[in-house]
Amino acid sequence: MGSGRVPGLCLLVLLVHARAAQYSKAAQDVDECVEGTDNCHIDAICQNTPRSYKCICKSGYTGDGKHCKDVDECEREDNAGCVHDCVNIPGNYRCTCYDGFHLAHDGHNCLDVDECAEGNGGCQQSCVNMMGSYECHCREGFFLSDNQHTCIQRPEEGMNCMNKNHGCAHICRETPKGGIACECRPGFELTKNQRDCKLTCNYGNGGCQHTCDDTEQGPRCGCHIKFVLHTDGKTCIETCAVNNGGCDSKCHDAATGVHCTCPVGFMLQPDRKTCKDIDECRLNNGGCDHICRNTVGSFECSCKKGYKLLINERNCQDIDECSFDRTCDHICVNTPGSFQCLCHRGYLLYGITHCGDVDECSINRGGCRFGCINTPGSYQCTCPAGQGRLHWNGKDCTEPLKCQGSPGASKAMLSCNRSGKKDTCALTCPSRARFLPESENGFTVSCGTPSPRAAPARAGHNGNSTNSNHCHEAAVLSIKQRASFKIKDAKCRLHLRNKGKTEEAGRITGPGGAPCSECQVTFIHLKCDSSRKGKGRRARTPPGKEVTRLTLELEAEVRAEETTASCGLPCLRQRMERRLKGSLKMLRKSINQDRFLLRLAGLDYELAHKPGLVAGERAEPMESCRPGQHRAGTKCVSCPQGTYYHGQTEQCVPCPAGTFQEREGQLSCDLCPGSDAHGPLGATNVTTCAGQCPPGQHSVDGFKPCQPCPRGTYQPEAGRTLCFPCGGGLTTKHEGAISFQDCDTKVQCSPGHYYNTSIHRCIRCAMGSYQPDFRQNFCSRCPGNTSTDFDGSTSVAQCKNRQCGGELGEFTGYIESPNYPGNYPAGVECIWNINPPPKRKILIVVPEIFLPSEDECGDVLVMRKNSSPSSITTYETCQTYERPIAFTARSRKLWINFKTSEANSARGFQIPYVTYDEDYEQLVEDIVRDGRLYASENHQEILKDKKLIKAFFEVLAHPQNYFKYTEKHKEMLPKSFIKLLRSKVSSFLRPYK
């Protein structure tokens, strides 16, 4: 992997021009070879050189080039390798064979011709092939005629040649005297008995394959150099010394000749010489789970993308990308062969793995009636002065109070009773209870609705709200009381009260003995905090004892309609303050007597726990989950939305009909507005409560009975008190419209545009926003800090993070294109710097890189010593490479620049690096330059796997710990990879072993 660019190209061009100027005369050099003005021999080659030429004799000739003489190869001791005759020709030679032989494929050996194979050798009856020749034979009762091919029937009588008993081995001649004389065929000699014939070397080379010598006993066969005589005394056997015996692979000399064998992964062919690769993938896919790739002499299993090969190098296992660091910003869901990133509520996915805050306010003000404030992961609607409070749906504003308070608001009940000398108090919270465990030693509980608070600058002298709700100021007085209590030898832990201790809390009795109907309070905030008593001389309790502090804040209201002629608002206020103080006094006693209860979802909870004080009390197991959580396997998990924690069963229970819970880990559910105990079980937010007006309808409070949105308006949400106008005088085709798309616009806007109701035209979405749908009146702002490359974007996928560059870590880190693994933005420039500690150098692995290859290098990644174009360049590319590469930096520090054009985009890169001790530079260089590191697909996958590359980096950064690492990672790395590293590390660290 690398660039086609040549570092220092400009320098090279300058050198070429300088040399051209210096040798301007040489630049006009004459090519004597082309013009024919050379004096080379006809059997020589002319080679032009600067300002001259040289002559070289052709192959097969010898001399100085100006005089060349043919080399007679046949004069060599081995006859040029020819086993029979060698014929010298100009510049070469050729081998020929005797009659009865033909030249072998190697051009040197001679093999017997089987004359009988073609036309029976011309024999009338039978043909017998012999080395270098053949003979015709006749059946019984016949003898061979003088032409040595036809057969003549023998007569029964007579002493002439026609008689079968004439005794001649070859030819019988009748003499003039009536006798017979025997003769031999050409190449044979008559023996002393004048009847038999003796073979000579003149016939069929004496039956010898190579050389033949005549002796008294007959021909004696011999073999050419590097051949041996067979046990038959005629045939010459090849040896492994000659052309490896003709074997493709291994050759073994045997009594019957050469014996060829093939290595593992190859099969010997029928010619007993050639080896052919076995395609293991043809049988059962080679045993591979996914992909089998045949290689020369072997095969290799590989896995589909998203899977990794196990150490048995056959089976594939899904890669759990979610186990890697930095895979997803929020939630990672592993899937077979892949993964999926999800974002928390209020965030949107971009760049495949990243989450950015959604600016809900950019989408028609988030649906708010008036103001909208974006917050991380959410947003908040606001009501301006004079428009009342925020509606329960969180978007509309209620009408200003008409001096009768807010009877529908959630109330908390604080009730106390006295039985003898014992005071028992209970805090009952029917709705809007919030439980928040702050730590192992504390929690907070809030109940009810706090009174609206004014901004500090506008607070009244008594601290009450002086906001725009003037009627609330006049009609309702908010009274606040705060108290702090201390419980010794107890620890903050909300736990269910034992049945034997339960006593019903009655109503508090006022100073005059009358029932206290004002024990309802609008809001209570309770905080429990446990800490250990510090050691000291003044400590009244033994060191290490638990001390629990309870902090209680109460809010109550006094209403104008409760005034009488004898007691106005100030009088009512004083009464309420006295009653609250009396309640707090009884509350303090009940706390000291361990008789203060928190009543949620029909269950009584104690706030602090004094272990071992009550006989028979069940000890809580140390491993139990805290309230608001349930056990899932070995972990404690918060109760999800739509459920609440039931203290008696210690389980998460779905919210009953008519209630909802949008928070996790709560002890009760909130009542739906106007609840009639109808609705789904397990409702997760107020919008799922029953009886709400559906989209396209509205009502005064958002509940039935509802009215359809008038023509010219629409409402996309449920439970709303109003409908939004189309704007610009536009109308709708029908009542009950649920979207701006139902408005009759003058033009139909396509994705990437929004309809401007002022000028009735389609406007392109500005940069940094997008619109995927038709006929909309808004563009959504890109999530988080992302933006688009151009205006008119149609998808959130076109939103990209442009942040990149910076100073990188001294030991390890990543060089990552902006928005990775999503496509990087156009027209961006990133600069990174790596400056290792002293005596450390940089190793970089490029697993893969994706840059557009058709834009003529508009997008470039370069790594060099510093920003100067003439500094030492380590790496430069403008192309896509999916094959990994590892290399060491050519300089001690690196300046890295990534620059993109305005037109193109691609996936980019995530390039890891590590710094290593320069004492191991030779070893690291040896490893990364070894082609075997990249030859196998499985080795390449190691350089792409985030976990395995980390293990590889550990070896390179600390080679002395190699053997410890291999034991740790041997279950992760292929054996071939470990073998490669082991040989190099061992030879470097233990050179003499």
From Swiss-Prot:
Pfam families in UniProt: cEGF, CUB, EGF_3, EGF_CA, Ephrin_rec_like, FXa_inhibition
Effect after changing G204D: In SSFSC2; uncertain significance
UniProt key word Methyltransferase: no
GO molecular-function terms, A-Z: BMP binding; BMP receptor binding; calcium ion binding; identical protein binding
Keywords: Calcium, Disease variant, Disulfide bond, Dwarfism, EGF-like domain, Glycoprotein, Repeat, Secreted, Signal
Signal sequence region: 1-20
Keyword Transcription regulation applies: no
Domain CUB: 804-916
Reported tissue expression: Highly expressed in osteoblasts. In normal lung, mainly expressed in bronchial epithelial cells. Tends to be up-regulated in lung cancer cells.
First-listed, main subcellular location of the protein, grouped into a coarse class: secreted
Record localization: Secreted; Cell surface
Functional description taken from the UniProt entry: Is a positive regulator of the BMP signaling pathway, required for proper chondrogenesis, osteogenesis and skeletal development. It acts as a coreceptor for BMP ligands, particularly BMP2 and BMP4, facilitating their interactions with BMP type I receptors. It is required for ligand-induced recruitment of BMP receptors to lipid rafts. Binds to TGFBR2 and activates TGFB signaling. In lung cancer cells, could serve as an endogenous autocrine and paracrine ligand of TGFBR2, which could regulate TGFBR2 signaling and hence modulate epithelial-mesenchymal transition and cancer progression.
Disease: Short stature, facial dysmorphism, and skeletal anomalies with or without cardiac anomalies 2: An autosomal recessive disorder characterized by reduced growth, skeletal abnormalities, a distinctive craniofacial appearance, and dental anomalies. Cardiac anomalies have been reported in some patients.
Protein name: Signal peptide, CUB and EGF-like domain-containing protein 3
Species, as recorded: Homo sapiens
Gene encoding the protein: SCUBE3
